[in-house]
C-alpha cells in the first residue's frame, strides 16, 4: 500500500489492488456501525463508486416521533467540514447512515401508524473520520482519514495518521475471516404485536 502525496487533510492512502469493497467490508465487519454503500451496478455514471466506513467518532439516532431530527444533526455536521481531494471518489468522510421512511413525519404532518412493528429510528447517522472508497472504473481503492473530531491542525493530522494505521492493520491482520454468523431465526414463531382482529382492522380487511 502506498501513500498518495497530500499537502493537507484528508490523509489519503491508495489501497492494494487485492482489496475490493466486499473484502474490505468483511474485514471491518466487527467494528462498530460498519456501513457499506455498494454500487452493485458497475456503471460510469450510475454505479462508479462503492464506500465502506466503520467506527464513527460520533453516532446519532432520533426516534420516529415527528421531532425535527435533521435540525438536531445539522450543527454537529457543520463542525466537521473538509476540502474534497479532486479526481478521487467524492465521499471522503462525514455523515452517512439511515434515513427511514418515518422521517417524513419531521417534514410534514402525517398520521402515525397504529402499530410500529419494527421500531426503527427516524434516522441513524454516523460521523465517519475514516472512509474506504472504490472506483470501479479505474479499479483503484483509497483510504481517507480526516483526523476528526480533532480540529487543531496538528492534532488532527496526528489523529488522521493514527487512525489510518489502525485501519490498515485491521485490513492486514484479519485475512479473510468473517465475524461470527448471525443466529438462526425461528420463522415459525409468531411475531405480531397485535391481535388478528386488530391486524385486519388496521389493514382495512
PLM regions and their residue ranges:
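Donor-binding/catalytic cores of nucleotide-activated saccharide
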Residues: 61-96, 102-108
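Extended accessory regions or peripheral subdomains of proteins
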Residues: 1-34, 39-67, 101, 105-205
